Every structure is written in structure tokens, then in C-alpha cells.
């Protein structure tokens, strides 16, 4: 059997520990979101234009869970077994899932604002159009670092068992791409979430939705933005690996907060799991 050298800064225990964290987080998020997806498909009462955003958020998170499980598998092997092309596919698929998920957070916030404040009804034509635009833009922006285009580069994380945007490049292409993505997919969604939920504070007297986004993606984004100005390789490889692992826990928070914590969605999940309508779903 071939022997592979461990990545610099990582021991066998580190590889096992990070792999286990990715495995546990990936499996938990996968099953939580899978139940959410199947419940939407099986329970007719759940199939509303509003819930369609939550359904698509779960689909995007399933993609990120699968991405993390692939990284967990490679971590247990101690090397990346899928070659250069596999790295590009892994980076692209993960980026599509991330960008789509964050976009659907903004779409759900916008929908709830109109649901509670303007009392405007959501139509399938509107929900479907927004969903197509979100997925289309996610694919478009995620494709930019692919070799055929070359705006940014997908490469290995420090542990060499998963692929993402290479933040160690620090060149003009990386800087312009990172700034663009940060503005479009972090700053803008944060503004939408903050303004929408502030307007309906009487109904949502909690800030968990906003805090979850910052907790999962804030540290990783700070490092990527910092890499636009300084070389980040001085940061410990373990810390640089910890940040994307933390970001990959976002599907768990999304499932709990947006599906299982949603009064318009959890009743359908309960009905799917038990065969009985919940009290709030009967109202």
C-alpha cells in the first residue's frame, strides 16, 4: 500500500480529529436537511411558495454536507485521492452550495418581511423566478475560479484533503474576486437580514438567524479578506483549517433555525415523521 506524507503542521491525530469533526458535522447536517427536503416533497400542505425558499436552502446545505463528507473521507485516507480534476469539481461544488445557501438566507428574510409587514402574498411565479436566479448566479460566480476562466484559483486547504478558493495567492485576480464575493454574498445578505428582521422585531425577538451567519462564516471571511492585503501563511495551518471546518457546520444551524424552528415548516416535518398533524399545523 502506498505511503503518503502528512501535510506540514499536521499529525496523524490531527488528520483523524479534523476528519471526525467533518464526518460528524456532515452526517448530522445531512440527515437534518434530508428530512427537511423529503418532508417538503411528501407533505402537500408544506408546498407553498414561501416554504420553497426553505426547501432550496436545505438542498444547498445538503450539497455542502456532501462536500464536507468527501473531505472527511480524504482526511481518513491522509491524502486527496481524486486528482487535480477532482479538486476543481470539489471546490466548484462547495462554492455553489455556499453561495446558494447564503442567498436563500436573504430570500427567506425578504419573504418574511413581506409576510409580516406588507402582508403581500408570495406567488409561485415570484418564488420560482427568484430561486432560478439564485442558483444561476451561484453557478456563475462559483465557475469563475475554474481553469477555463481563471478569476481566482481552486486549490487545497492546508490539510490537503479538501479544495476551496486559494486564499494564499494574494494576487490581483484573488483580491478582485474575493472583494466581489464578500460584497455580494456576505455584506449584502447581512444588510438584507438585518433590515428585514429589524422591521419584524415584534414577531422575531431573537437575533439567532443573524448571529448564526456571522458565527459560521465571519471568521473564515475575515481571514480571506485579510489575505487580500497580507500573507496569511504565518497563521497556524491548524487554525486555517479550523475556520472552514467551522463554516461547514452552517447547514446544522440552518436546519434548526429555518426548518425545524419555522412554524410554517416544522408542522409538515412532524407530519412526515409521525403521520399526524401537529397542533399548530391544524390551525
Which ranges hold each PLM region?
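Extracellular N-terminal segment of 7TM GPCRs
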Residues: 1-31
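Extracellular/periplasmic helix-loop-helix junctions in multi-pass membrane proteins
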Residues: 225-239
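Alpha-helical transmembrane segments of multi-pass membrane proteins
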Residues: 26-29, 56-68, 130-142, 182-190, ...
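Loop architecture of class A 7-transmembrane GPCRs
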Residues: 2-7, 79-95, 127-131, 140-187
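Class A (rhodopsin-like) GPCR signature focused on the TM5-ICL3 interface and adjacent 7TM helical core
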Residues: 104-116, 145-157, 179-227, 257-259
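Seventh transmembrane helix
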Residues: 215-225, 241-283
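Extracellular TM2-ECL1-early TM3 structural module of rhodopsin-like
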Residues: 11-20, 49-108, 114-122
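Cytoplasm-facing ends of alpha-helical transmembrane segments in multi-pass membrane proteins
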Residues: 30-41, 65-69, 96-119, 131-132, ...
Amino acid at each position: 500500500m502506498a505511503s503518503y506524507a502528512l501535510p506540514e503542521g499536521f499529525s496523524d491525530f490531527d488528520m483523524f480529529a479534523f476528519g471526525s469533526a467533518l464526518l460528524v458535522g456532515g452526517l448530522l447536517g445531512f440527515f437534518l436537511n434530508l428530512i427537511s427536503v423529503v418532508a417538503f416533497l411528501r407533505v402537500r400542505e408544506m408546498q407553498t411558495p414561501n416554504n420553497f425558499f426553505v426547501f432550496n436552502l436545505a438542498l444547498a446545505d445538503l450539497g455542502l454536507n456532501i462536500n464536507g463528507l468527501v473531505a472527511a473521507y480524504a482526511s481518513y485516507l491522509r491524502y486527496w485521492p481524486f486528482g487535480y480534476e477532482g479538486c476543481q469539481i470539489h471546490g466548484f461544488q462547495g462554492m455553489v452550495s455556499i453561495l446558494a445557501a447564503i442567498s436563500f438566507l436573504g430570500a427567506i428574510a425578504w419573504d418574511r418581511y413581506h409576510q409580516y409587514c406588507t402582508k403581500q402574498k408570495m406567488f409561485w411565479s415570484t418564488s420560482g423566478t427568484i430561486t432560478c436566479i439564485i442558483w444561476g448566479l451561484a453557478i456563475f460566480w462559483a465557475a469563475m475560479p475554474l481553469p477555463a476562466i481563471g478569476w481566482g484559483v481552486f486549490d487545497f486547504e492546508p490539510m490537503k484533503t479538501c479544495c476551496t478558493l486559494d486564499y494564499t495567492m494574494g494576487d490581483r485576480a484573488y483580491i478582485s474576486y474575493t472583494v466581489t464575493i464578500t460584497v455580494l454574498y456576505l455584506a449584502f445578505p447581512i444588510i438584507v437580514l438585518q433590515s428585514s428582521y429589524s422591521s419584524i422585531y415584534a414577531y422575531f425577538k431573537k437575533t439567532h438567524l443573524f448571529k448564526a451567519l456571522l458565527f459560521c462564516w465571519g471568521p473564515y471571511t475575515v481571514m480571506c479578506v485579510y489575505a487580500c492585503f497580507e500573507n496569511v501563511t504565518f497563521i497556524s495551518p491548524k487554525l486555517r483549517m479550523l475556520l472552514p471546518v467551522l463554516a461547514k457546520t452552517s447547514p446544522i444551524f440552518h436546519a434548526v433555525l429555518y426548518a425545524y424552528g419555522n412554524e410554517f415548516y416544522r408542522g409538515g416535518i412532524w407530519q412526515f415523521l409521525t403521520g399526524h398533524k401537529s397542533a399548530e399545523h391544524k390551525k
